[in-house]
Amino acid sequence: HGGLTISGGEVLCQQPFAEALVDACHAEDIEAAIETNLSFPWEKIEPLIRKLDLVMCDLKLADTDAHKKWTGIGNEQIKENIRHLAESGKPFLVRTPLIPGATDSDENIAAIAAYLAEVNTKNTMLYYELLNFNPLGDSKYKSMRRKNPFEGVKPLPTARVKELQSIAQQAGITVRVE
């Protein structure tokens, strides 16, 4: 197939541009997708979502307090938007970056998978993807002159990623690992 995926920063911060780009793609029969954290109110993002062929979003942590600790915001809006997305019938996928000591607990992955199984009533979630930790983000912290809290952290062993995949699959959803 192929197409265009708009990613960030955060795409929803540039929504008018993203909508114009999606319209231009569709005018040329090019499919369009976004990668997003879905942290904006649904009524603001729904016009863009309606135009897309696919939405890829992150859900890092199931617990809102833990989400706030690690990202600076709670996850209520994100989870509400995933529910809206599932109800909309739009094809989507959800990803969790596996950050050692932050998002990689059995409980977190099981809770996210259970939530996704609960909301995927129209079976339009293509799959849930577990993304192993990528230490390449270090340059971002350096460019912002901030200390990287994950400096020196290594990706999870393949066996551990497969174990988390198995835990998530117990919710009855399709789970991929990268």
Locate predicted features.
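Short, flexible active-site recognition loops that position polar ligands and cofactors
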Residues: F150-R160
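Conserved AdoMet/S-adenosylmethionine-binding subsite of the radical SAM
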Residues: H1-L136, K140-K142
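A cross-taxonomic marker for long C-terminal extensions/tails that follow the last structured domain
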Residues: T158-E178
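Short glycine/proline- and charge-enriched loop/turn segments
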Residues: K142-E151
